[in-house]
Design a protein with these regions (language model features):
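Glycine-rich portal/gate segments that line the openings of hydrophobic small-molecule binding cavities
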Residues: 43-93, 101-106, 142-150, 154-158
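Beta-strand/loop substructures that line and gate deep hydrophobic ligand-binding cavities in soluble
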Residues: 86-142, 151
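Residue-level detector of alpha-helix boundaries and kinks
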Residues: 7, 17, 59, 129, ...
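A generic helix-loop boundary/linker signal
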Residues: 12, 47, 64, 130-134, ...
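Hydrophobic ligand-binding cavity/cleft-lining segments
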Residues: 1-52
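Short amphipathic alpha-helical segments with heptad-repeat character
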Residues: 16-19, 23, 134, 138-141, ...
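Solvent-exposed residues in well-ordered beta-strands and their adjoining turns
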Residues: 14-18, 60-64, 99, 110-114
Length: 158
């Protein structure tokens, strides 16, 4: 059995745009494929609920040798401050926290591998769960700085 505690990571970058403008970008999940190294596309389940807490969206992820889709629920949506979603409702929580900075906005991307995700991996992968969890953790650690750099480039290009 693996450690079922929450695994977390976060990194920040300063972006030369306002918190509201940056929020408008990162909360548009249909643009995720422009900056994510893994998620190639996202779409809202119900356009009328898009961007609101409780709204659901699907994402398509690709890594060498594997493609899969996820369903996520928006769990935080406060313009200029935070946008976050939970994959599968309780498996992994991703978020973007925004704070005014002297020169623009500090954008912090957060990642939490939740106990529900650990349990699912243990059920699905058995003895291989620790390796699979380590692999997904490494993908997040590698992807976050790449994602932040891409968001900065896109936001500052206007």
């Amino acid at each position: 059995m693996t450690d079922s505690g929450i695994r977390t990571h976060q990194e920040s970058i300063t972006v030369q745009v306002s918190p509201d403008d940056l929020y408008d970008l990162v909360s548009d999940v249909t643009r995720t494929g422009e900056w994510s190294p893994t998620c190639t596309a996202c779409w809202w389940d119900e356009q009328a609920d898009a961007g609101q807490v409780g709204a659901w969206f699907h994402g398509r992820n690709e890594v060498p040798g594997r493609t899969w889709e996820t369903k996520s629920e928006v769990v935080a949506a406060e313009r200029g401050r935070e946008f976050a979603w939970a994959v599968g409702g309780n498996l992994v929580r991703w978020g973007c926290e925004l704070a005014p900075a002297e020169q623009g906005t500090t954008l912090t991307e957060t990642w939490h591998f939740l106990p529900g995700g650990i349990e699912l991996f243990e059920e699905n992968y058995g003895d291989q769960a620790p390796d699979e969890i380590a692999d997904r953790t490494q993908q997040a650690l590698d992807g976050i700085p790449r994602t932040l750099a891409a968001i900065k480039r896109i936001a500052e290009a206007g």
